[in-house]
Amino acid sequence: MKLTRRESKNRRHRRVRGKVVGSPERPRLAVFRSNEHIYAQVIDDSQHQTIVAASTLEPELKSSLASGANRDASVQVGKLIAVRSLEKGITKVVFDRGGNLYHGRVKALADAAREAGLDF
């Protein structure tokens, strides 16, 4: 029987999370993509703590964006998460795409974070 899109995404997500682990030296940059918005968190898995977060729901981004569900919004979130991470002294991260394919909005966020100074 063919898998649904949700089942495929959940399987990819479990597979990726089994391999990607954040540490204090290289925390995990986790991306969650919904139909309306995109969210990014830098997480230290050893302490189960979110160090930095950014999303299209934040007032400074939401007012300047036409939509939270396009590549332009993802680029802005990528830049913002990189700036906040660098302020906290985090330069190296492990990228966790979740169950999403590395394409489109997820790739745009990753590329913007790299350009803004994060190393992964």
From Swiss-Prot:
Disulfide bonds: none annotated. It comes from Nostoc punctiforme (strain ATCC 29133 / PCC 73102). Keywords: Ribonucleoprotein, Ribosomal protein, RNA-binding, rRNA-binding. One of its GO terms (molecular function) is structural constituent of ribosome. The gene is rplR. Residues 1-22 are annotated as: Disordered. Belongs to the universal ribosomal protein uL18 family. NCBIfam families: L18_bact. One of its GO terms (biological process) is translation. This is one of the proteins that bind and probably mediate the attachment of the 5S RNA into the large ribosomal subunit, where it forms part of the central protuberance. It comes from the Bacteria. Part of the 50S ribosomal subunit; part of the 5S rRNA/L5/L18/L25 subcomplex. Contacts the 5S and 23S rRNAs. GO terms for cellular component: cytosolic large ribosomal subunit. Residues 8-18 have a biased composition (Basic residues). This is Large ribosomal subunit protein uL18. Pfam families: Ribosomal_L18p (PF00861).
